[in-house]
Amino acid sequence: MAQSAANIDESWIGTNAEQVFGQHTGCPVFVTNDADAAGMAEMRYGVGKGEEGVVMLITIGTGLGTALFYKGMMIPNTELGHLLWPHGKSAEAYASSGARERLKISRKEWAERFNGYLLHLERLFSPDLFILGGGESKFFEQYKS
């Protein structure tokens, strides 16, 4: 059941997407959010393959998506971009790529904000591995200097 619609039309809220797509395609369908799907791919084929500890994938784009794994098993729908930040808004309203664009802040200032988000997640979950992806990941080379 679609519970939110951050990047799709709001008419999907309350829709059993698995049933709709399954009926139209005649195939079994599994629906998940983009961060969980990316996390499953990374754990099976990417840098998370074989990792047994706590692994967290973060998609950095319009918002902040998360996927959390422990001993190779996904803990679904973590939605950690919705954690409340000290200013009373969500972390993604403060530290996402969308926030950087909306607030017109420099990549340096954004990186400091995002680093604060990573430190917060590290305190909460002590992950053995962070995997960063999403639209902002194409700019990671710029953050090395």
Residue ranges, per PLM feature:
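Glycine-rich phosphate-binding loop and adjoining helix at the ATP-binding site
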Residues: 1-52, 145
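Histidine/lysine/aspartate-rich catalytic loop segments that bind and position anionic ligands
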Residues: 69-101
